[in-house]
């Protein structure tokens, strides 16, 4: 809520499938190709748009407050930026915007046609800026004795895109792989928007020096989280490192594969 600063609902994690029905309805209408062409993504609860619609559909007062201009949306970077600047800056970068399923990666704008499918008002969306940019200053920290009054907030970028940048994958074809909760492979395609017919996503890598670069991404949602489930849910071992013993054991898959 723009006036109170309080979230209108709990943050919805990327793994959540609670908006699956919303996505299924759009897929049944044959809209997957349209969304892929404009956003590089597939219709999936993984992305923000269906989560936003779910909140509008299920949380009382949100629609009325949005009509009054009192509702703001943001991925976690936008929310943290807004909090750190004491509500002065409502923005995101190209890489995070490209993961919402409502951002056109060709025109670099929130897409009016896609917004209508989710009944999302454009007024709630953040301004999209380069990944390297002075967004504002962390005035919320000015009351803390840190030796200076304000800290400049000079960058926003998505997590996997930041890993691509951090691994210095600046050339076309350079690829990185990250293993964590899930597994994610990203390949820099520079200024080329490349569509895959093998299930890869097309996304914005970052926006720097007045231009946008793109990437291809392969996503596996469950990897490290499977180890955590085996440890905490199935109680097959006490420490995550113990899973290696089971993996290296004789016929660990029981002939399944």
What do the PLM-derived regions correspond to, one by one?
Residues 16:
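Carbohydrate-associated surface elements
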Residues 121-125:
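A conserved beta-strand/loop element that lines the FAD pocket in flavoprotein oxidoreductases
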Residues 8-9, 95-102:
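Glycine-rich phosphate-binding loop of ATP-grasp-fold ATP-dependent ligases
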